[in-house]
Amino acid sequence: MTPLTVPLNEAARPLDRLADFPAIPEGWAYLDTAATAQKPQTVIDAITRAYDTTYATVHRGVYQRSADMTLAYEAARRRVAGFIGAASPDECVFVRGATEGINLVAQCWAETQLKAGDRILLSQLEHHSNIVPWQLAAERVGAAIDVVPLTPDHAIDLDDMAAMLTPAHKLVALAHVSNVTGAVLDARRAAELAHGVGAKLLLDGCQAVPRLPVDVAALGCDFYVFSAHKLYGPTGIGVLWGRGELLEAMPPYQGGGAMIDKVSFAGTTYAAPPARFEAGTPHIVGVLGLHAAIDYVDAIGLEAIHAHEGALVREAREALSGLNSVRLFGPADSAGIVSFMVKGVHPHDVGTILDEGRVAIRAGHHCAQPLMDHLGIPATARASFGVYNGPRDVAALVKGIERVTRIFG
């Protein structure tokens, strides 16, 4: 089984912040946090306040409000850096989301550093956003892609990874936490294995950042990406962290305002990172919303969140395993996610019936079709927990599954 980054702390288990989330009505079990988290009132207030009272452009105006907004914008960058253990705020690039962050690395690092015959290593459980950008880059430069198999409980098999790695591998890109199985990667060991053959390691942290303490220095990775909307923040904003020396060597991602040093028809020079990768007017208020979301999560404590979600996962798995019709996927110690199937029932039908009982889950391939092919199934049903969930939501889920089995029994 994949080891947890942080041991469960039973004392921290009583955690139910439902009252903080105005969009969750009474009696509705929202179990789709892995797709997108609901937003606490503090985040909504921060966004509304910015538009209502303080809004202005950043890095451009000489008037006081613009200067104040620029200070707030860069304060958010410093907050992000501290939150993930970055050595400098300049290593934190604001992007539209993790998908754009991965595409940025694929185009600006992989396509400039890889050559024909080089290899990229992925795993069978990756999200499409951590597959397709590398396929595009590999096709353009003539590189090849290898795929790490999974353990019997659907986690990345690092022993197999160790056996597969060669000096031809220049990049390893893996999910820190699987969006389907909730399996937690031993990221430190993955980094050591990758660096042992001279490869760089990119981690997709979308499911990890809302659930586990993340310290990029301690993990030893070279790039790390995540999206704000899974961290109780707004959509349309995310973060790419990269080692300073790697970002410095990368060309721009897009051309436009803000990413330049000097423009002339004789030639253009570019700004240093992170500005080099942030062309155009940024998602200013989204960045402030991300800051508020980090403050919200930090006030609760990621150790407490991890313990709380771990307890709900155990309760859900124990209850569902008692139903003969249910097949569970992933390790028992998954981070906040329970994927399952009801025998003889398509997951879309499961999701529809649960919705009738006011239980919201995800049903489908979860943007992980290669994993579904590996499992030999078209889709799964997925329940994923957040700080607003409690035992009542597990009970509602189980009651709904029992109804599914009666209807299709």
Give the residues covered by each predicted segment.
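Pyridoxal 5′-phosphate
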Residues: 1-409
